[in-house]
Swiss-Prot record:
Lineage: Bacteria, Pseudomonadati, Pseudomonadota, Gammaproteobacteria, Enterobacterales
Organism, as annotated: Escherichia coli (strain K12)
Domain characteristics, as noted in the entry: The PTS EIIB type-2 domain is phosphorylated by phospho-EIIA on a cysteinyl residue. Then, it transfers the phosphoryl group to the sugar substrate concomitantly with the sugar uptake processed by the PTS EIIC type-2 domain.
Entry's Gene Ontology molecular function annotations: kinase activity; protein-N(PI)-phosphohistidine-fructose phosphotransferase system transporter activity; protein-phosphocysteine-D-fructose-phosphotransferase system transporter activity
Name of the encoding gene: fryB
Annotated active site: C11
Protein name: PTS system fructose-like EIIB component 1
Length: 108
């Protein structure tokens, strides 16, 4: 089974930080060996919407948000790791590693 990381990034204005966080998470996830899909909610609406199948198949789900995402109820049945946009932008690789360590310790 392949590793799949999905994320949702959103900020109040939805101009720069949303897309900076999405790019940082995507680059770090690919580097860590994940298949990646990232939904953005910004000034241009919802882009690259995460489907029910994406959510069901995800190994890791991250919300990097500064606002409550639209259609947030899609994620109610899954563990979602919430981080700030700044954390995603500045330390995406470190965040992914921390989440992997948390998951590994929960499985022991």
């Amino acid at each position: 089974m392949s590793k799949k990381l999905i994320a949702l990034c959103a900020c109040p204005m939805g101009l720069a930080h949303t897309f900076m966080a999405a790019q940082a998470l995507e680059e770090a996830a690919v580097e860590a060996g994940y298949e990646v899909k990232i939904e953005t909610q910004g000034a241009d609406g919802i882009q690259n919407r995460l489907t029910a199948q994406d959510i069901a198949e995800a190994t890791i789900i991250i919300h990097s948000v500064a606002v409550t995402p639209e259609d947030n109820e899609r994620f109610e049945s899954r563990d979602v790791y919430e981080i700030t946009l700044q954390d995603a932008i500045k330390n995406a690789a470190g965040i992914i590693k921390e989440i992997e360590e948390m998951i590994a310790s929960e499985q022991q």
